[in-house]
From Swiss-Prot:
Binding, ATP: G31, G33, K34, S35, T36, N240, P316, V318
Protein name per Swiss-Prot or TrEMBL: ATPase BagA
EC number: 3.6.1.-
Lineage, broadest ranks: Bacteria, Bacillati, Actinomycetota, Actinomycetes, Mycobacteriales
GO molecular function (one): ATP binding
Miscellaneous section: Was identified as a high-confidence drug target.
Organism in which the protein naturally occurs: Mycobacterium tuberculosis (strain ATCC 25618 / H37Rv)
The UniProt record lists the keyword ATP-binding: yes
Changes seen on gene knockout: Deletion of both bagA and bagB does not reveal any conspicuous growth defects in vitro. The double mutant is fully virulent in the tuberculosis mouse model. The double deletion mutant is not hypersusceptible to arsenite in culture medium, but it is significantly more susceptible to nitric oxide (NO) and it exhibits a glycerol-dependent recovery defect following mouse infection. The double mutant is hypersusceptible to extracellular methylglyoxal, suggesting that the glycerol-dependent toxicity is due to heightened sensitivity to methylglyoxal generation.
InterPro entries to which the protein is assigned, alphabetical: Anion-transp_ATPase-like_dom, ATPase_ArsA/GET3, P-loop_NTPase
Key words, A-Z: ATP-binding, Hydrolase, Nucleotide-binding
Family classification: Belongs to the arsA ATPase family. BagA/BagB subfamily.
Entry-linked PANTHER family: ARSENICAL PUMP-DRIVING ATPASE ARSENITE-TRANSLOCATING ATPASE, ATPASE RV3679-RELATED
Length: 340
């Protein structure tokens, strides 16, 4: 189940400029739920009859697990139907297959490329040239963005990428440096120029998933600063796993200082027909103080995000573990905040 929430900070919501974006890259510190949020975002963007591609680049088969489908092959398959007739397809990019596709596309090495795979040359090439891996991944992503159907219209209305975590996202997107380390010209260089242009355009937005905890927020702040220095477009910060405050602001402030009106609490319980033993009642008061302290600390951390002046979305806690149903609930929460 998904709980209602308030983080204590003011949520800016989804600005209209993001509604025209076609490439959404979702990153976040490990453990913040970035894969879950990427999946929910894809469902939201697909609502209303749109067609969205959800891309995985780290080989973990996380998309398959989230949508409860078999492991994904290296091809685009429908995995979900969105609200009002939309469709979400998924692609788990296999780096070796992408390399062979690249060799066949630019060098006509179809048969030779397959032979390279059999002798392990593909794995060898991507290992000794780490930048090549990111060039191939971003190149494939760009191809899905620009691909047209027989009517010369984009095949997909939007592409959502479950991108590498914040600690690696800048390097992953720094295609210019990766290519300069690999080639000064030729097909690799030419293709990468198109990737760079797309990543720095208003067609792209990078969304950072975080929790209202010190380490995730600090890593988010550092990643935003690094991405801004690279002049890459920041879309939003998505605060995941918020918890409800339950208390009015004035009561919350007092409880955080250890002040709880025990008589009022007991009277309220009795009015509701609840009578607790003294030990249980004392435990309830202790939990109230602990909860208020936690909410207050989260609100203080949220102030660091306020200072960014970056659009912020807030998502509630999924209490019983993430399943397909909770993905749709999170998607609805995003839609209520203007995501479209």
């Amino acid at each position: 189940m998904v709980a209602t929430t308030s983080s204590g900070g003011s949520s800016v919501g989804w600005p209209s400029r993001l509604s025209g974006v076609r490439l959404h890259l979702v990153t976040g510190k490990g453990g913040t739920g970035k894969s879950t949020i990427a999946a929910a975002l894809a469902l939201t963007l697909a609502a209303g009859g749109r067609k969205v591609l959800l891309v995985e680049v780290e080989g973990r088969q996380g998309i398959a697990q989230l949508f409860d489908v078999p492991p994904l092959p290296y091809q685009e398959l429908k995995i979900a139907t969105a609200e009002r007739g939309g469709q979400v397809n998924a692609l788990a990019i296999d780096i070796e297959a992408a390399f062979l596709e690249y060799l066949d596309m630019f060098y006509n090495l179809g048969i030779a490329g397959r032979a390279m795979r059999r002798i392990g040359a593909v794995e060898f090439a991507t290992t000794i040239a780490p930048g090549l891996r990111d060039v191939l991944l971003t190149g494939k992503i760009k191809e899905t963005v620009v691909r047209l159907d027989k009517n010369k219209l984009p095949v997909y209305d939007a592409i959502v990428v479950d991108a590498p975590p914040t600690g690696r996202i800048a390097r992953f997107l720094d295609v210019t440096k990766a290519v300069s380390d690999l080639a000064k010209g030729g097909p690799v260089h030419a293709q990468s120029e198109g990737v760079v242009k797309l990543l720095h355009s208003n067609q792209t937005a990078i969304h950072l998933v975080t929790l209202l905890e010190a380490l995730p927020v600090q890593e988010t702040l550092e990643a935003i600063e690094e991405l801004a220095q690279m002049e890459l477009p920041i879309g939003s910060v998505i605060v995941n796993r918020n918890i409800p405050a339950h208390l009015e602001p004035q009561d919350l402030a007092k409880a955080a200082e250890g002040e709880v009106d025990a008589d009022s609490v007991r009277a309220g319980l009795l009015t509701a027909g609840v009578k607790l033993p003294d030990a249980d009642f004392a435990g309830l008061l202790t939990e109230t103080i602990q909860h208020a302290t936690r909410i207050t600390a989260r609100a203080e951390i949220a102030q660091q995000l306020d200072a960014l002046q970056v659009p912020r979305l807030e998502l509630p806690t999924v209490s019983d573990g993430v399943d397909l149903g909770s993905l749709y609930e999170l998607s609805e929460s995003l839609a209520q905040q203007g995501v479209r």
